[in-house]
Amino acid sequence: MKYYLIAGEASGDLHASNLMKALKREDPDADFRYFGGDLMAACGGTLVKHYRDMAYMGFIPVLMNLDKVLSNMRLCKQDIAAWRPDVVILVDYPGFNLKIAKYVKTHLNIPVYYYI
């Protein structure tokens, strides 16, 4: 199966990497593509965007980087649509991930799971 995961911070990277290891045990042919970090990258697959390029805490930093936030959102939507995974797994990071969930369910009809 093709799995698309999104973890936008260090704790999500940890949980997603553990999930990836478990999925690989059950599905040795698992193919991963993700927004995440170094722990996920160590599990294999394709890192599309590192979380350190996405994480902005607080209202002012988000506003100051709104163009980057929106660009990351567009990149993520386009990448999911182009890769056509069997499932999308979202790990925490609700401000970003819930918008992606709505897009995927509405436009792509791919199953979405929110993990943690």
Label each PLM-derived region with a short phrase.
Residues 2-116:
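Active-site and donor-binding regions of nucleotide-sugar-utilizing enzymes
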